[in-house]
UniProtKB/Swiss-Prot annotation:
Belongs to the prokaryotic/mitochondrial release factor family. The keyword Cytoplasm applies. Methylated by PrmC. Methylation increases the termination efficiency of RF1. Pfam families: PCRF, RF-1. Keywords: Cytoplasm, Methylation, Protein biosynthesis. PANTHER family: LD18447P. It is found in: Cytoplasm. It comes from Christiangramia forsetii (strain DSM 17595 / CGMCC 1.15422 / KT0803) (Gramella forsetii). InterPro entries: PCRF, Pep_chain_release_fac_I, Pep_chain_release_fac_I_sf, Prokaryotic/Mito_RF, RF-1. Peptide chain release factor 1 directs the termination of translation in response to the peptide chain termination codons UAG and UAA. GO terms for molecular function: translation release factor activity, codon specific. This is Peptide chain release factor 1. One of its GO terms (cellular component) is cytoplasm. The modification N5-methylglutamine is found at Q233.
Amino acid sequence: MIERLNIVKQRFDEVNDLIIQPDVISDQKRYIELNKEYKDLRALMDEREKYISITDNIQEAEEIISDGSDPEMTEMAKLQLDEAKGQLPALEDKIRMMLIPKDPEDGKNIVMEIRAGTGGDEASIFAGDLYRMYTKYVEGRGWSHNIVDFSEGTSGGFKEMIFEVSGDDVYGTMKFEAGVHRVQRVPQTETQGRVHTSAATVMVLPEAEEFDVEIDPKEVRIDYFCSSGPGGQSVNTTYSAVRLTHEPTGLVAQCQDQKSQHKNKEKAFRVLRSRLYEMELAKKMEADAAKRNSMVSSGDRSAKIRTYNYAQSRVTDHRINLTLYDLSNIINGDIQKIIDELQLAENTEKLKENSDTI
């Protein structure tokens, strides 16, 4: 393991030198990429120092025990050896996980889309529940979020909700939420007390930078219309809302959340760029998942990933057969335990895949 860590140390020193070079600082794309790499390598260097300290302690203790000339020192060395050997396995496991090649998308911000599926009004209400669950989780993480576009349901909730989330490692955390979520409960409108099953689809798009996707302005049709969103009468009487249509792919992105037409256009372009980027990413994820037979990150938007059963207070994630009887806390934003298990499952898959090199 130390050989692998020493190779990483060489790269860390190289990156440390590169990020202060004028030609790198002037190249925005390269500078951002190297800064992200520096942050990851810095964390590994901290663990490398711990690893060297523990292995040095083991070697020192073994030498004292082997010498045996001082009984008191030998006893102290035995205690030191036991303590150091006890610390080593957990640290080695942590380092192995950190040595897994990181998905370059994981550090990106996201555009998140929630759409009501089968189930009529109840599906819209459930989509609203999911939006509230995610925003509470996002706020708890100290991330920021803002609405891009939405369409309200006739009896509450949303037929569609599109919002941006910004922070550290947002995509790497939230990407596991993409797929079909099902709810099993008695709707408020149900008089016979029958349980209905409804669904909502969640999409998580890594927010593409301008240098990730180049959009030819000639290929984008721009339409302006009156906003139906919040913001008072002035919003509804001016053509501030913006709809973009990317003609080669047919992809559409619109924003009506801001009073400013310019800001709405800017947001809509971010969403369009992210959707184009995600199209390519989904193909790559599908190919990668097929290669390692992964169910955690398959890139399949139609996959049923999770069921929320209100009668049993049960939440089941079907990808990893995880069942938790804690629905009220989960639907109120406490989804970290689910995300932790999904990240662990994906890292375990990657660890098997990279076992020869780590």
